[in-house]
């Protein structure tokens, strides 16, 4: 069976989802279930995982026994903040080491700061973390992050929360062709066709949050995204027909057609 393998663990779903921007935890759980996702990313700086005992905890609706939680460093702009946040996550989740690193460079665009990301990744990997890393669609940056030991490369399709879809498929294709670890599109997906295109390009998975949470019907969109990722993956494995401006061979046979029969 075709599985997504990250850091030695196999997953049936290639759709990863976030937990922010929903109306409440109940809607979060319902949408996650509809998506079929097994890996759920959580913003440690914005989500209660037990650090505030007086408030409801996300772990009550998305327990680690049912999902692989992926703590992330959303909102971090420095190496120090990112590393501190993931150390806290490891404490809150009883030694959990699979994490998503993002070090942002600009509060308006939320574009990644690659220099700081490389520094933070190196520190975290030395401390035993398995780092899935948010990055730009720069193939050189992606290669450098893989070389220092990141277990998955997560290039943006377009800016976080923009819903603009895949703006540079050529760079993504270069990253995919060169990578020896999973490549998961992270950020910019707006609708199901974007997810399908990412998978058709050969991405190993797609991570999204706003595309589902900001939809008019988040649960229905989660279901659509599940199907899109599955369809895109199957299309990639099947191998599409080559593109041609003109086709000299019709899809239906002409032999035996009235008017083409010999002797008539």
From Swiss-Prot:
Q: Which Gene3D superfamilies match?
A: Aldolase class I
TM region(s), chain numbering: none
Question: Per its UniProt record, what InterPro entries does this chain match?
Answer: Aldolase_TIM (IPR013785), Thiazole_synthase_ThiG (IPR033983), ThiG (IPR008867)
What keywords does the record list, in alphabetical order?
Cytoplasm, Schiff base, Thiamine biosynthesis, Transferase
* CDD domains on file: ThiG
Some GO term, biological process aspect, for this entry: which one? thiamine diphosphate biosynthetic process
Q: What's the catalysed reaction?
A: [ThiS sulfur-carrier protein]-C-terminal-Gly-aminoethanethioate + 2-iminoacetate + 1-deoxy-D-xylulose 5-phosphate = [ThiS sulfur-carrier protein]-C-terminal Gly-Gly + 2-[(2R,5Z)-2-carboxy-4-methylthiazol-5(2H)-ylidene]ethyl phosphate + 2 H2O + H(+)
- Name where it mostly resides: cytoplasm
Copy the pathway line from the protein's UniProt record: Cofactor biosynthesis; thiamine diphosphate biosynthesis
Q: Where can this protein be found?
A: Cytoplasm
Q: Which SUPFAM superfamilies match?
A: ThiG-like
Q: Which domain of life is it from?
A: Bacteria
Q: State the GO CC annotations.
A: cytoplasm
Give binding positions for 1-deoxy-D-xylulose 5-phosphate.
Answer: 161, 187-188, 209-210
Any single GO molecular-function term of the entry would be: thiazole synthase activity
Q: Where is the active site?
A: 100 (schiff-base intermediate with dxp)
Report the EC code(s) recorded for this entry: 2.8.1.10
Q: Which family does it belong to?
A: Belongs to the ThiG family.
Please give the subunit comment from the record: Homotetramer. Forms heterodimers with either ThiH or ThiS.
Q: What does this protein do, in the record's words?
A: Catalyzes the rearrangement of 1-deoxy-D-xylulose 5-phosphate (DXP) to produce the thiazole phosphate moiety of thiamine. Sulfur is provided by the thiocarboxylate moiety of the carrier protein ThiS. In vitro, sulfur can be provided by H(2)S.
What's this protein's name?
Thiazole synthase
């Amino acid at each position: 069976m075709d599985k997504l393998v990250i850091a030695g663990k196999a997953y049936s779903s290639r759709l990863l989802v976030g937990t922010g921007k929903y109306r409440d935890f109940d809607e979060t759980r319902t949408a996650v279930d509809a998506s079929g996702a097994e890996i759920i990313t959580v913003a440690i700086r914005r989500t209660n995982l037990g650090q505030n005992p007086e408030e409801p905890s996300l772990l009550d609706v998305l327990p680690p026994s049912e999902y692989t939680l992926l703590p992330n460093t959303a909102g971090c702009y420095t190496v120090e903040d990112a590393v501190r946040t993931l150390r806290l996550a490891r404490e809150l989740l009883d030694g959990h080491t699979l994490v998503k690193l993002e070090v942002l460079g600009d509060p308006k665009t939320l574009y990644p700061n690659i220099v700081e990301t490389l520094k933070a990744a190196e520190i975290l990997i030395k401390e035993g973390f398995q780092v899935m890393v948010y990055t730009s669609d720069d193939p050189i940056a992606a290669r450098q992050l893989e070389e220092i030991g990141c277990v998955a490369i997560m290039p943006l399709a377009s800016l976080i929360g923009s819903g603009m879809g895949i703006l540079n498929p050529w760079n993504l294709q270069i990253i995919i062709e060169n990578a020896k670890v999973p490549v998961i599109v992270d950020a910019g997906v707006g609708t199901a066709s974007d997810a399908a295109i990412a998978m058709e390009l050969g991405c190993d998975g797609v991570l999204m949050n706003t595309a589902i949470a900001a939809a008019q019907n988040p649960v229905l969109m989660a279901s659509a995204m599940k199907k899109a990722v599955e369809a895109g993956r199957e299309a990639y494995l099947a191998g599409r027909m080559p593109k041609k401006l003109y086709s000299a061979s019709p899809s239906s046979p002409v032999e035996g057609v009235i008017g083409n029969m010999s002797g008539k």
